[in-house]
Amino acid sequence: PYPTKVEMNNIYKAALRAPDHAWLRPTSFIEIKDKGIEKLSKIFEEFASKNVDQKNIDKYKNAPYRAPMIIAAVNTYKEHPKVPKIEQMLSTAASVQNILLALNALKYSSIWRTGKIAFNKFVDKKLGLEPNQTIIGFIYVGKNKGKQKNIPKINSREFVKYL
């Protein structure tokens, strides 16, 4: 199962509270579920048939079926004298983190997928994006069916310096 419309509305509200210098609103989303998963699978398969080894095509084709819902996070670059492209992309990335946190709070499992399949103009175009738009990643959403992956503990002191 995936989140309800009401839950998703709240999740998107949380996402859109991400830092956004000059209120440019560079972030949008494509919600993919049900028949959309099949469409995305075909797009991934078409991309793979032209860009990866033959033995890996099925991996790309089957990837969307790993979750009942996928959210494509889209960044729309808007030229601005004080807000460079990287800041706008970071705003969209922060919105993805907000989505992951909101999903976790609602007891959904999620993973942020990137790589070749996310960072290419072929998939962007197939999803109807404009030239100034790019996918920041795909968020796979569902309920965990088994034991949750054990994430190693981190000693935060190893990552902090004090001035």
Predicted feature residues:
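Small-aliphatic-rich amphipathic alpha-helix that forms the alpha element of a beta-alpha
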Residues: 15, 71, 77-125
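Short, electropositive alpha-helical surface patch
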Residues: 123-136
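Conserved hydrophobic/aromatic beta-strand scaffold that supports enzyme active sites
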Residues: 70-74, 138-140
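C-terminal helix-cap and adjacent tail motif
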Residues: 135-163
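N-terminal amphipathic, basic helical "cap/leader" segment at the start of enzyme domains
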Residues: 1-66, 163
